[in-house]
Amino acid sequence: MRKKNYYLVSDGKLRRHENTIYFENEDGKRPIPINSIYAIYALGSLSITSKAISLLAKEGVCIHFFNRYGYYIGSFYPRESLVSGEVVLRQAEHHLDSEKRLHLARAFVEGAILNMARVLKKAEQDDSDVIASLQHLSSAKSIVELMGAEAAARNAYYTKFDEILKNFEFGKRSRMPPENEVNAMISFGNSLLYSAVLSEIYHTQLNPAISYLHEPSERRFSLALDIAELFKPVIVDRLIFYLVNNGIVTESDFDSRLGGILLSEEGKKKFVRHFNERLEKTVKHRKLNRKVSYQRLIRLECYKLVKHFTAVEKYSPFVMWW
């Protein structure tokens, strides 16, 4: 049975009976065979029995939790079965060595900028202001300078959104709370992507807490933030363009009663359905010479980092080629 992501938008409870997980809510009880679960996204209020947690942990299922506003609040990250002392040591070495860390951070920023430019090109927009930020990368002597170049590129990138989007006005980036519908979708989509990246890291030898562009923190898996930078334009932003310009998401899918503008429950259902379809979408991989899903591209990026840390192959960032 092919494993898939489950998005639980409504409030409910997860229980276990034998080797099946059940999701119970006011609409009834829904069985979820354990061997069909890749990851769970809890977008509503969710309670879980200890027996359910035990089975999910045994099967290596990550559970990602979001608050009522759609913001990521944490993950249940099962005990790692692929842990490698050598890889963790090499990860730590590359973080502690300022030159090695700067090399990886620069690669993440370069990949993010090139992907933003590629997305603009696909949308028939001028990418020259975004590309101009690349010239600052080679001379950057610190993480702060690299993040400044990335921020400049992203600001230039965002100025094109109002030319791409037909039915909503973007203006500028705003967070917590989002000031308009587009910002609400960006924040929600980025949270989903961060969680998807974390799920892929779990299935590799990488330690999710050791990062290079973003500063490690006690309360976040910052390597997922590093890798997510590469995929935000390709997965989240292109999805938003598609949803808006095809009239799939409309003003009725948002709620302004909670302060700011947020996706309603129905809006979240639409978004996660299409987000998951985007993860499952396939492209022909140039090096592997076969079709791989967007979700698999994230895993492959993790493997590239493992190869870099173990001196098998120097890391180069994912850049959209199609």
From Swiss-Prot:
Domain of life of the organism encoding this protein: Archaea
Keywords, alphabetical: Antiviral defense, DNA-binding, Endonuclease, Hydrolase, Magnesium, Manganese, Metal-binding, Nuclease
Binding residues for Mn(2+): 150, 214, 229
Pfam families: Cas_Cas1
Gene Ontology terms for molecular function: DNA binding; DNA endonuclease activity; metal ion binding
E.C. number(s) listed in UniProt: 3.1.-.-
One Gene Ontology biological process: defense response to virus
Names of the cofactor(s): Mg(2+); Mn(2+)
DNA-binding in keyword set: yes
Keyword Metal-binding: yes
Family designation: Belongs to the CRISPR-associated endonuclease Cas1 family.
Subunit structure, as described in the record: Homodimer, forms a heterotetramer with a Cas2 homodimer.
Role: CRISPR (clustered regularly interspaced short palindromic repeat), is an adaptive immune system that provides protection against mobile genetic elements (viruses, transposable elements and conjugative plasmids). CRISPR clusters contain spacers, sequences complementary to antecedent mobile elements, and target invading nucleic acids. CRISPR clusters are transcribed and processed into CRISPR RNA (crRNA). Acts as a dsDNA endonuclease. Involved in the integration of spacer DNA into the CRISPR cassette.
Protein name: CRISPR-associated endonuclease Cas1 2
Organism: Archaeoglobus fulgidus (strain ATCC 49558 / DSM 4304 / JCM 9628 / NBRC 100126 / VC-16)
Lineage, broadest ranks: Archaea, Methanobacteriati, Methanobacteriota, Archaeoglobi, Archaeoglobales
